[in-house]
């Protein structure tokens, strides 16, 4: 089935008598195999009977509130794409055709009042309040979306699988968007003209909605600034925090200046950083599906794999980058032997990790954990020092050519694969592994 159209309703009989025939005609003319699902929240005006008379599927809302209605609709949907729109005719059903054409550009298509070309015909108070809310949320969550609160959306159903949300009313629209974007799904807006509802009354209570939206906004802000967000690394490069922005750009400058021109490059554990985006002939490898989804829109060759078993043939690369990866993994000799294996003779290894022997990192890590409790510091399970890291790479057949620091805390080393590895029996103690 191509599409499921979800209509959350409470006492919308008069509007459904107009909307459902128009939707049916639209699906027929577009030659779409689709269904219309009316999710009833306890109507008392004959909405259920009217919808059933039009031959569409009607289900009871499981739970209470707009969020519960949306969740019920997602669970009932059988189409490859899921369309949600208001049943009050403020969302012109004819616009579905334009949204359908845009589906190849992203996983979520939003009918937007505030992107260029979009218009909202409503009273000044509601228009001003809506614009203010959308600007606030867009900036708080750092989303490339101008109409965060639009409920007129087309979702790829595969993106909704496993999606869980806690919001119960209209604030759920922002939560859904943040959670999907944090999982690496792409969003596109198409300009849309909004008109007030045709009949009936709105079910939004501004004060209650405002308080619920504030609570949801804070929860989603924490998610957007956690490692769970697919674009965490890229956002850090453009951070509004000067120190974080400097740190990220210094790391990028050192790593890219060493790697550029190296030939075929592997960024192992690339995350969503700009390093892999900035290098020609680079392949990004990452275990997290969300980060891979995010990077696919940048036209970069990508592979999913583990640092413990790199999914590449021997001697496949001229340069391997491992930036801010090894401290997140339990120490194992195979991490370094795998990087050596996929490097060609004379190939370059660029390693970046905090130096736990420096006073700088001992000061910065507690401060970082306090200010950003969801950040990388909480994920560091293996602590390296410069001395121990040199011992390890030397033992695995690398010669250290150069080392650089960021704020005397983060160590970045450039190493060269030697023709003859140092004998394996020359072992050095492994670095201390502790839970950060």
Regions found by a protein language model. Name each.
Residues 221-313, 319, 336, 351-352, ...:
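Conserved N-terminal segment of class I S-adenosyl-L-methionine
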Residues 89, 325, 355:
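Hydrophobic adenine-recognition pocket in adenosine-nucleotide-binding enzymes
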Residues 1-120, 158-163, 175-183, 188-189:
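Structured catalytic core of nucleotide-sugar glycosyltransferases
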Residues 103-104, 329-330, 343-345:
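Helix-to-beta-strand junctions that scaffold the AdoMet/dcAdoMet cofactor pocket
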Residues 333-348:
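A short glycine-rich, Lys/Arg-flanked "PGG" loop and its adjoining helix->strand segment in the class I
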Residues 140-143, 165-242, 349, 414, ...:
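Hydrophobic helical membrane-anchoring modules
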Residues 61-76, 81, 93-170, 197-207, ...:
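Acceptor/aglycone-binding surface of glycosyltransferases and processive sugar-polymer synthases
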Residues 319-325:
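A short beta-strand submotif of the Rossmann-like class I SAM-dependent methyltransferase core
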């Amino acid at each position: 089935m191509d599409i499921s159209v979800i209509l959350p309703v409470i006492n919308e009989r008069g509007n459904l008598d107009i909307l459902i025939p128009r939707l049916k005609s639209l699906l027929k003319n577009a030659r779409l195999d689709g269904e219309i699902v009316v999710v009833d929240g306890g109507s008392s005006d004959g909405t259920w009977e009217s919808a059933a008379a039009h031959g569409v599927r009607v289900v009871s809302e499981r739970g209470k509130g707009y969020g519960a209605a949306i969740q019920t609709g997602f669970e009932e949907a059988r189409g490859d794409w899921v369309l949600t729109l208001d049943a009050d005719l403020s969302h012109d059903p004819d616009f579905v055709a334009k949204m359908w054409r845009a589906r190849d550009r992203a996983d979520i298509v939003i009918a937007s009042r505030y992107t260029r070309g979009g218009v909202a015909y409503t009273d000044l108070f509601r228009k001003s309040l809506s614009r203010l809310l959308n600007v606030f949320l867009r900036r708080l969550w750092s989303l490339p979306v101008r109409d965060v609160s639009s409920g007129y959306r087309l979702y790829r159903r595969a993106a909704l699988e496993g999606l869980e949300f806690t919001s119960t009313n209209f604030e759920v629209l922002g939560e859904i968007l943040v959670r999907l974007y944090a999982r690496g799904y792409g969003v596109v807006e198409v300009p849309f003209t909004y008109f007030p509802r045709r009949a009936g009354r709105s079910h939004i209570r501004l004060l209650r909605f405002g308080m619920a939206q504030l609570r949801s906004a804070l929860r989603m802000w924490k998610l957007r600034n956690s490692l769970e967000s697919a674009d965490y690394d890229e956002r850090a490069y453009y951070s509004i925090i000067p120190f974080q922005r400097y740190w990220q750009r210094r790391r990028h400058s050192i790593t890219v200046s060493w790697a550029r021109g190296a030939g075929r490059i592997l960024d192992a554990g690339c995350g969503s950083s700009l390093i892999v985006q900035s290098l020609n002939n680079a392949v990004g490898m990452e275990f997290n599906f969300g980060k891979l989804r995010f990077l696919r829109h940048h036209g970069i060759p990508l592979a999913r794999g583990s640092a413990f078993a790199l999914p590449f043939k021997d001697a496949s690369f001229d340069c391997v980058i491992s930036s801010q990866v090894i401290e997140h993994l339990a120490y194992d000799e195979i991490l370094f032997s795998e990087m050596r294996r996929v490097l060609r003779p004379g190939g370059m290894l660029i390693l970046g990790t905090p130096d736990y022997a420096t006073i700088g990192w001992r000061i910065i890590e507690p401060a970082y954990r306090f200010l950003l409790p969801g950040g990388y510091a909480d994920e560091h399970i293996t602590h390296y020092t410069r001395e121990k890291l040199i011992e390890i790479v030397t033992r695995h057949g690398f010669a250290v050519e150069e080392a650089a620091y960021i704020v005397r805390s983060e160590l970045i080393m450039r190493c060269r694969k030697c023709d003859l590895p140092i004998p394996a029996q020359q072992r050095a103690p492994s670095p201390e592994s502790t839970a950060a």
